[in-house]
């Protein structure tokens, strides 16, 4: 059988990795996966879904990244993100309701901070992954 250099042959098809979406994966990747325990209770899955929905907006992702550095008041977030104050306040309300941020009054302003820095890791991983795909 004659093949062109760009046509893979059977000898080249199973080289131990396949290309999926720009990422390398072992050809037999599912055989190597550990067996996972039973899924968490439905309440935990629902709570995780709510948390991820609260983070699922570009402005809210940017807010979490800003608060990762230090606590901020609304006008600091407006200046850093270049979005209108009512929009920042609306997104902070959603993040606060989801338990992502907390607010503490300081004089006439409210200082917002992350309730849990584990959430910053989720956002950082998502942003890093999106950046890999953009290259």
Curated annotation (Swiss-Prot):
PROSITE patterns, per this entry?
Answer: HTH_ARSR_2
Q: Does the keyword DNA-binding apply?
A: yes
GO BP annotations, alphabetical order: regulation of DNA-templated transcription; response to zinc ion
According to the record, the residues making up region (Disordered) are 1-32
Q: Enumerate the spans annotated as HTH arsR-type domain.
A: 40-134
Indicate how activity is controlled: Binding to DNA is inhibited by zinc ions.
Entry's Gene Ontology molecular function annotations: DNA binding; DNA-binding transcription factor activity; metal ion binding
Cite the Pfam families for this sequence: HTH_5
Q: Which UniProt keywords apply?
A: DNA-binding, Metal-binding, Repressor, Transcription, Transcription regulation, Zinc
- In which residues is Zn(2+) 2 bound? 129, 132
Induction (UniProt): Induced by zinc. Negatively autoregulated.
Q: Which residues bind Zn(2+) 1?
A: 116, 118
Q: Where is the composition biased (Basic and acidic residues)?
A: 11-31
Query: Cross-referenced InterPro entries, in alphabetical order?
Result: ArsR-like_HTH, HTH_ArsR_DNA-bd_dom, Metal_resp_trans_reg, WH-like_DNA-bd_sf, WH_DNA-bd_sf
The record ties this protein, via SMART domains, to: HTH_ARSR
Q: Which residues bind DNA?
A: 74-97
Q: How does it assemble?
A: Homodimer.
Q: What does this protein do?
A: Transcriptional regulator involved in zinc homeostasis. Represses the expression of the smtB-zur operon in the absence of zinc. Could act as the metal sensor that controls the expression of zur in response to zinc availability.
Q: What is this protein called?
A: HTH-type transcriptional repressor SmtB
Q: What is the source species? A: Mycobacterium tuberculosis (strain ATCC 25618 / H37Rv)
